[in-house]
Amino acid sequence: MSQSETFEKVKKIVIEQLSVENPDTVTPEASFANDLQADSLDTVELVMALEEEFDIEIPDEAAEKITTVQAAVDXIN
């Protein structure tokens, strides 16, 4: 799967999980906490949704570093 395909799938999950009203705010640089108003529970649930969608397991240590949309894409690829 290409980087752009992964980004589009991650973007879709982020929009659903965080109830993002304006999809244009979900950019690679968008911070879950600062730009998308996600709290720590939202982030945990988001990582779980990504693990399920991509059929992967993200170790806790790596999950803590997923703070932006691009970081999520990088962890998956």
From Swiss-Prot:
Domain of life according to the entry: Bacteria
InterPro entries linked: ACP, ACP-like_sf, PP-bd_ACP, Ppantetheine_attach_site
GO molecular function annotations of the record: acyl binding; acyl carrier activity
All residue ranges annotated as the Carrier domain in the record: 4-77
A Pfam family this chain is assigned to: PP-binding
Free-text description of this protein's post-translational modifications in UniProt: 4'-phosphopantetheine is transferred from CoA to a specific serine of apo-ACP by AcpS. This modification is essential for activity because fatty acids are bound in thioester linkage to the sulfhydryl of the prosthetic group.
GO biological process: lipid A biosynthetic process
UniProt subcellular location: Cytoplasm
Gene Ontology CC: cytosol; membrane
Entry-linked SUPFAM superfamilies: ACP-like
Modified positions (O-(pantetheine 4'-phosphoryl)serine) in chain numbering: 40
Keywords of this entry: Cytoplasm, Fatty acid biosynthesis, Fatty acid metabolism, Lipid biosynthesis, Lipid metabolism, Phosphopantetheine, Phosphoprotein
Pathway entry: Lipid metabolism; fatty acid biosynthesis
Similarity comment: family membership: Belongs to the acyl carrier protein (ACP) family.
NCBIfam families according to UniProt: acyl_carrier, PRK00982.1-2, PRK00982.1-3, PRK00982.1-4, PRK00982.1-5
Function: Carrier of the growing fatty acid chain in fatty acid biosynthesis.
Protein name: Acyl carrier protein
Species annotation: Anabaena variabilis
